[in-house]
Amino acid sequence: GNASITRLFVRKLIPTVAPGKDMNDIVSAQFDYSQLDKPDNLNKIRLNSTAVQVENLSDDSVAVSYVDVSTGDAKNVRVKGKRCIMACYSTIVPHLIPELPAKQKAGLSYGEKSPLVYMSVLLRDGGIIEKTGVNQFNCPNSEYDWISTAPMVTMDDYKPEIKAGEPLVLFVTNTPPPKRDLNNPNQTARDLLKAGRHKLYRMSFEDYERPLKKQLNKMFGQYGFDADKDIEAITVNRWPHGYAYHYMELFDPKWGKGQAPHEIGRKPFGNITFANSDSEAFAYVDGAINAAWRSVKEQLLK
């Protein structure tokens, strides 16, 4: 998935972080995280550092304040640079840059990310799924609407195989479906996405596990599957702020060119420009790459 793209970027920026040269060896490459933030690096990646403020300064530079917890104890740090590209969740940007114009803040805050749940289910024996002759299941009106064998990544030096009698991982996903308030005709898709996020936060592990086992038993019980016996482990990845918001004709106005909220929100502000998929109102990696290209170009043309 996109993790491999990120790993390729990091290795290109900091060659000492991992061996190898291209996509064919990136999956198995062992990364040395101690190389990410060396003082003599041309490019530095600083983990465990949460930005809390970004501001244009009078000397034509940009200051970024962040909380550093890399040493165990939290400390406030401020760094300066000529330029800054904000590539984080758009709705948080007005809190990091309070000097932004009100109209731009509103544009940045308009979108509501889709909450998602990604689950990995380790089966003791994948042979039961093999009996069905199917590896991808769409399950409308079920608790989990997509179940499949985990997508395999195959590269030159990484070629996994599925063998009968051996463990198998199922990939399970859904978007928490809140019930629409029938007494509120003005309820929008953004309202529903927010309600879904709150539902996701309230759910315990058992709230995810119970309907999953019930659904898998219904789907595969005829092939001898018993969830209590055949499931070795379950991992639940809650993604409260998942996909970037896509406009929906049923709920959103039709804006003129350059007037959509994401277009207003991403306008350069001094020496600060804006990237990430939110700034394109498009959730996928090509949208994020387009945003990166645009934001860098905006800096170079200043």
Enumerate the language-model features and the residues they cover.
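Conserved flavin/dinucleotide-binding core of flavoenzymes
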Residues: 122, 128-302
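Low-complexity, highly charged intrinsically disordered N-terminal segments
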Residues: 1-4, 8-24
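C-terminal substrate/ligand-recognition segments
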Residues: 2, 13, 51, 168, ...
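Structured loop/turn residues at beta-strand edges in well-structured enzyme cores
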Residues: 40, 49, 79, 229, ...
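A conserved beta-strand/loop element that lines the FAD pocket in flavoprotein oxidoreductases
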Residues: 18-25, 33-52
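Alpha-helical packing segments of well-folded alpha/beta enzyme cores
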Residues: 1, 5-9, 47-50, 92, ...
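Mid-domain catalytic core of redox enzymes
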Residues: 43, 47-182
